[in-house]
Every structure is written in structure tokens, then in C-alpha cells.
């Protein structure tokens, strides 16, 4: 019985130790003590109860202690609970300390929570980044299109990382400055001869205000000539004027044709009236003969005049037909 009790007690002790080691990261606690970081078992148990991974807090704390940073467990745990990347912020603080950059932990944590890569920002502060723009097109005063590509050397401004705009704003502002500088040039050869004038003009405008970067230099990498926009516009204007003139000429021709048809209709109307009047002549002549107002001699003279008039009209029509059929 005594031996059985010892076995039961031993099993209970083993189970208790297993539960303890599974709930309390004793290995991590030993590592912290060995590194000179004072962390109590109660602190680790409290992290477990607050659903904080002790390894993601104590590991960066050991790293910060070895680097000489004065950080506390509460600072790292608070940043972890806020959804931040504790390890990255600590690495950024270590890199900033090595580069003699003033970066308090609170500012680094705020930058990390804002969605910025704080470690990359510190590295960019030490090693400036080169941003290359696509070809930016502008038109000089003489109508020649000029294309320019620029390389922008920027350094991260840690004090403006929270709330400052990014690379897209830098590229857009530099592009606007290049277009404005090219457009103010009287001749495109001025841009080709002195491309550094673009850099000086754009750099003097303070384009990095309100951004998360500080522009160190703007270098024109390539300049190319595009289309003759002025000539193209003149050609298009001439073509438009031609089309307008043709449209007006067609309108005048249509009006002339309509007027001609109207005149022909009026001629036919007048001829109808003449025929109507001629149809009344025999009746009037018969009435005149009955009443003695017209003699037989007068009647035959009138007939001769009508025959003579008909012959002249026939000759005139034949002459007009011959003139129309003759080659021009």
C-alpha cells in the first residue's frame, strides 16, 4: 500500500508539472533570466490570462535589453494588444539607435499602427530611396512635344510618416512640375540643351511638403522628342475649315437647285395661264365676227401674225437645242 501511494503521488506531481509547463513558458522565463531581463512567473501567467503570447513580447524585450533600449513589458504588451507588430517596432528602434535617429518607442508604435512599415522607414532614412517616374509629356510653346523621365531621390521623414502622403503624391507633383517647366519653354531645344533647368525649377517648388518624404534631388534621366502638336492642330483646323466650306457650298447648291425647280414650276404655271387665255381667243373672235367688230381681212391678218410668231418660236427652240448639244 505504501508503494502504491508513492506511485500515485509521483503521477500527480508529473501531471502538475506538465500542466505548469504547458501553461507557464518556463523555458522562456529561464531565457529572460539568463539574458538579464527581470520577468516574474506571475507576469507570464498574467499574459496567458490576457491571451497575450508571451513569446511575442518577451522575445523582443530580450532583444531590446541586449541592444541597450530601456523598454518595459507593459509598453510591448500594450502595443501587442493594439494589434501592432512588436518585433518590427523593436527592430526599428534598434536600427534608429544605431543610426543616431531620434525615434521614441511611442512614435514607432504609432507609425506601425498607422499601417506604415516603420523598419523600412528607418532604413530609408539611412539609405535614401530612388523613385523613377514614367515618361512625362509636355508641350513647349513652339508646339513640339517633349517627353522626360526623372529619378527622384527621397529620404523618409519619420516625423511626417503618420498622416503624410506617399510615393504616388511625389510622382504626381514632380510630373506636374516637369509639364509646367516644359510648357513655359519658348522652344523645345531649350529643354534638350539644358535638362538640368527642369530639375532646378521643380526642386525649388518644395514638392515634398505634406508628404512622408524629403526630396534630396531630382535628376532628369532621359529626354525625348514627341509629336509636333502645333502642326497637328493646324492640320486638323484646316481640315475642319475645309469641311465647313464644303458643307456651305453644298447648302448653296441645294438652295440653287430648289430655286431653279421653283422657277420651272412658276413657268409651267404661267404657261397654263397662257393656254387658258388662248382657249378663250376663238370664242372672243367668233363673238367679234358675229357682232361685226372684226372683219374677215382682220381675221386673216391675225392668223398670219400667229403663224409668223409660231415659226419664230420653233426656230428659237431649235437653236437652243443645238447649243445645248454642241460640245463644251
From Swiss-Prot:
TM annotation in the entry: 1-21, 26-46
Main location: membrane
Domain of life: Bacteria
Membrane topology field: Multi-pass membrane protein
Keywords noted in UniProt: Cell membrane, Membrane, Transmembrane, Transmembrane helix
GO cellular component annotations of the record: membrane raft; plasma membrane
Compartmental location: Cell membrane; Membrane raft
Family per record: Belongs to the flotillin-like FloA family.
Record text on subunit structure and interactions: Homooligomerizes.
Described purpose of this protein according to its UniProt entry: Found in functional membrane microdomains (FMM) that may be equivalent to eukaryotic membrane rafts. FMMs are highly dynamic and increase in number as cells age. Flotillins are thought to be important factors in membrane fluidity.
Protein name, entry field: Flotillin-like protein FloA
Species assigned in the record: Staphylococcus haemolyticus (strain JCSC1435)
Amino acid at each position: 500500500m505504501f508503494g502504491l501511494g508513492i506511485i500515485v503521488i509521483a503521477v500527480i506531481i508529473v501531471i502538475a508539472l506538465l500542466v505548469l509547463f504547458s501553461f507557464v513558458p518556463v523555458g522562456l522565463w529561464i531565457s529572460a533570466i539568463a539574458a538579464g531581463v527581470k520577468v516574474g512567473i506571475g507576469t507570464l501567467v498574467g499574459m496567458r490570462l490576457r491571451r497575450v503570447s508571451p513569446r511575442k513580447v518577451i522575445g523582443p524585450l530580450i532583444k531590446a535589453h541586449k541592444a541597450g533600449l530601456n523598454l518595459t513589458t507593459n509598453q510591448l504588451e500594450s502595443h501587442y494588444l493594439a494589434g501592432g507588430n512588436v518585433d518590427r517596432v523593436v527592430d526599428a528602434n534598434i536600427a534608429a539607435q544605431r543610426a543616431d535617429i531620434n525615434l521614441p518607442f511611442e512614435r514607432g508604435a504609432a507609425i506601425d499602427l498607422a499601417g506604415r512599415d516603420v523598419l523600412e522607414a528607418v532604413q530609408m532614412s539611412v539609405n535614401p530611396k530612388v523613385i523613377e517616374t514614367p515618361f512625362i509629356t509636355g508641350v513647349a510653346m513652339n508646339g513640339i512635344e517633349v517627353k522626360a523621365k526623372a529619378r527622384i531621390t527621397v529620404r523618409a521623414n519619420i516625423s511626417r510618416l503618420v498622416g503624410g502622403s506617399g510615393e504616388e503624391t511625389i510622382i504626381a507633383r514632380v510630373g506636374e512640375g516637369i509639364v509646367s517647366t516644359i510648357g513655359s519653354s519658348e522652344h523645345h531645344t531649350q529643354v534638350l540643351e539644358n535638362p538640368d533647368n527642369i530639375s532646378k525649377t521643380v526642386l525649388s517648388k518644395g514638392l515634398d511638403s505634406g508628404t512622408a518624404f524629403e526630396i534630396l534631388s531630382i535628376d532628369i534621366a532621359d529626354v525625348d522628342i514627341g509629336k509636333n502638336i502645333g502642326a497637328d492642330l493646324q492640320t486638323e483646323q484646316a481640315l475642319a475649315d475645309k469641311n465647313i466650306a464644303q458643307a456651305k457650298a453644298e447648302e448653296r447648291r441645294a438652295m440653287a437647285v430648289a430655286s431653279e425647280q421653283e422657277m420651272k414650276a412658276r413657268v409651267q404655271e404661267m404657261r397654263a395661264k397662257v393656254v387658258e387665255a388662248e382657249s378663250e381667243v376663238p370664242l372672243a373672235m367668233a363673238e367679234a365676227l358675229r357682232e361685226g367688230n372684226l372683219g374677215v381681212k382682220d381675221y386673216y391678218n391675225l392668223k398670219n401674225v400667229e403663224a409668223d410668231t409660231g415659226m419664230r418660236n420653233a426656230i428659237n427652240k431649235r437653236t437652243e437645242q443645238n447649243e445645248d448639244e454642241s460640245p463644251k
